[in-house]
Each structure stands twice: as structure tokens, then as C-alpha cells.
Amino acid sequence: MVRIGVVTFPGTLDDQDAARAVRLAGAEPVSLWYASTDLAGVDAVILPGGFSYGDYLRAGALAAASPVMSSIRRAADGGLPVLGICNGFQVLCESHLLPGTLMRNEKRRFHCSVQQLQVASVDTVWTCDFRPSERIHIAAKHGEGNYVADAATVAALEANNRVVFRYTANPNGSVHDIAGITNEAGNVVGLMPHPEHSVEELTGAGTDGLGFFRSLMTFLSAQL
């Protein structure tokens, strides 16, 4: 069975939600502790949402320096699929696995709603089951989701098809309506909205989030 690691930092909130989404996709979630460098031989890693280390210094900055991230950086450079959700996206940027940074929302308010996203790239491990330009609905909740990068970085992301999702109604001021991006290899994806909160009709946010986890399963099955 496919085994997907779900990291828990001090202040992580959504690790259990991510684990449930993994189970619904047919894989086994494996808990990974922030203070350990052992990735337990998992096939992929999820950095879930929350407020790691209370967002002190900068959101994701202290988590980026934790022992588990040293192992994840090496593994990601070797091709391990990694998904960073909300605070996990912030950690990926602070770890320099993804470029840019996430700043306070443009209106300086915490934002919580179901967001419509447009799929901008299906050429990643985590989006290969979506259709190009497909519009999906994913829950979002963040106070520091305003994606910012210098002009050269944004131009490179656009030119190399590394913008993965865009907001259709930008809730936070992110440059170019960017909701998520990927690395050059397409194995590391970060986004602010929460696909793990959009996997069951019961929650009211639909099931479009399952596409992330099913995409991973499709990718891994093709590697066998």
C-alpha cells in the first residue's frame, strides 16, 4: 500500500484532516514528527496547515529549521512528492523548496471561505488527474496567504508553467492571482487553500480536494 507521511509541527492543526484525506484516496497515512529526521520510507509527504510554532518570527520560518525538514529537503531534491498546504506552503517557501513568500492578506484580515480555483497546470505529481483550466472549489482559511515574489521570479514561474492554481476571485492580494505553485521538477507543490477540507460532501466544501490525492496515486501507480 502507498504510504504518505503527514508531518506534525508544534502548532499544526490539520494533520488529522490530511490523514483522513489520504485514507479516502486509498493510501496509508504515516505520522512524521517534526523533531525526527526519519521519514519512515514513505512514498510522499504532506506538510499540513496550522500555525507552526505560533507563526513566531515569520509564518513557517521556525518549522523550516526543524530536523524533519532537513530530511524532506534532501528527499524532495531526489524526487519525493511533497505537498504543502497553507502553513505547509509557507514552510516550503521558508525552506527554499519553493520561491517567494506569503505575507499578510491585502485587507489585513483572516479569510475563511470556499474558493473557486482554476487549474493552471496539470504537469505535476499532485495535479495530473485534473483537466487543464478546470475550475474547482476548495476551502481556504488564512491570514497570511498573500503570495509575493520579485518580478523576475514571477516571470519565471509563468514562463515555465509553474503556476499550478489561480484564484478566480483573489481573496488576499496574491500577485497574478496565484493560489499555488510548483518547483521545476513538478514533485513539490504548495498552495494556500485546503484540499483536505474538501474531500467529503458532509463538510459542505465539496469533494474537489480528492483530486490532489488521487493525482498522487495515479503518479505513483505509473512508477510501478
Swiss-Prot record:
It comes from Cutibacterium acnes (strain DSM 16379 / KPA171202). Pathway: Purine metabolism; IMP biosynthesis via de novo pathway; 5-amino-1-(5-phospho-D-ribosyl)imidazole from N(2)-formyl-N(1)-(5-phospho-D-ribosyl)glycinamide: step 1/2. Pfam families: GATase_5. GO terms for molecular function: ATP binding; glutaminase activity; phosphoribosylformylglycinamidine synthase activity. Its EC number is 6.3.5.3, 3.5.1.2. It is found in: Cytoplasm. It catalyses: N(2)-formyl-N(1)-(5-phospho-beta-D-ribosyl)glycinamide + L-glutamine + ATP + H2O = 2-formamido-N(1)-(5-O-phospho-beta-D-ribosyl)acetamidine + L-glutamate + ADP + phosphate + H(+); L-glutamine + H2O = L-glutamate + NH4(+). Its main location: cytoplasm. Keywords: ATP-binding, Cytoplasm, Glutamine amidotransferase, Hydrolase, Ligase, Nucleotide-binding, Purine biosynthesis. This is Phosphoribosylformylglycinamidine synthase subunit PurQ. It comes from the Bacteria. The gene is purQ. The keyword Electron transport does not apply. The active site is at 86 (nucleophile), 194, 196. Coiled coil: none annotated.
